[in-house]
């Protein structure tokens, strides 16, 4: 949310951010930090006397939202779960901070990218697993923003039907379910090809493609959705190339969808 608020002109209005608000890099220097998403310093927030606090239903705790509201602070709680939810959310945020024009411009760009994808020929499908954690290994269900984004590229989530949004799963489970592509994003777990490439090749086998990608582009909604939709375009091409070598990305292999 912070990165998007800055993108639509809200930097000068920011009086505080969590320690996990790291984007846009270089533009948050001097903004007070008010703790983490799960353990914010409510007293510190009140000392900053904000007119409005932005929160996310999944990332922030209900008790902290209620504490702020009880103290008379207005709290905007959002939770975009689908790519189509993002543009309306941006327009709403723009209206809340008096930046309607900039917000509408950004939302319109996202709408245009999304419309172009819908109007393009339907992509072929590929079965995938998107790993968000290691030890224990965890993945995502279809009830997530990233799964909705990858669906636009033709992705079929082999763990999509799970009741939990972020189910635990063993590496062998994905092979049994027919995953042809494994995604290893840079966040929330910091997967890196140079550090984890050999390990995942041993765990997941050499046949499935292994993509180390920028998690910010695929998991973060808001202004980052633009990069996510561009990644979808690249992934449509990548996933459709049958002649590429199997295994992790590298010289001679197709470009990874992001990063």
PLM feature spans:
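N-terminal ligand-binding lobe of clamshell/alpha-beta domains
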Residues: 1-259
């Amino acid at each position: 949310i912070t990165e998007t608020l800055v993108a639509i002109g809200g930097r000068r209005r920011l009086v505080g951010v969590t320690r996990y608000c790291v984007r846009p890099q270089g533009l948050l220097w001097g903004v007070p930090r008010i703790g983490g998403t799960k353990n914010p310093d409510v007293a510190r927030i009140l000392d900053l006397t904000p007119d409005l606090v932005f929160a996310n239903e999944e990332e922030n705790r209900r008790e902290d939202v209620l504490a702020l509201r009880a103290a008379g602070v207005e709290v905007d709680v959002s939770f975009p779960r689908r790519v189509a939810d993002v543009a309306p959310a941006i327009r709403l945020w723009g209206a809340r901070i008096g930046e309607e024009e900039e917000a509408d411009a950004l939302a319109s760009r996202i709408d245009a990218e999304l419309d172009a994808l819908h109007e393009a020929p339907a992509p072929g499908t590929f079965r995938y697993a998107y790993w968000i954690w290691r030890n224990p290994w965890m993945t995502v269900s279809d009830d997530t923003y990233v799964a909705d984004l990858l669906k636009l590229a033709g992705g079929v989530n082999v763990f999509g039907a799970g009741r939990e949004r972020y189910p635990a799963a063993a590496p062998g489970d994905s092979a049994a379910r027919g995953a042809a592509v494994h995604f290893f994003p840079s966040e929330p777990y910091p997967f890196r090809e140079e550090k984890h490439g050999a390990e995942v090749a041993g765990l997941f086998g050499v046949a499935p493609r292994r993509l180390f990608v920028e998690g910010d582009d695929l998991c973060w909604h808001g202004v980052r959705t633009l990069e996510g939709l561009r990644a979808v375009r690249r992934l449509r091409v990548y996933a459709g190339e049958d002649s590429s070598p199997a295994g992790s990305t590298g010289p001679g292999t197709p470009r990874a969808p992001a990063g």
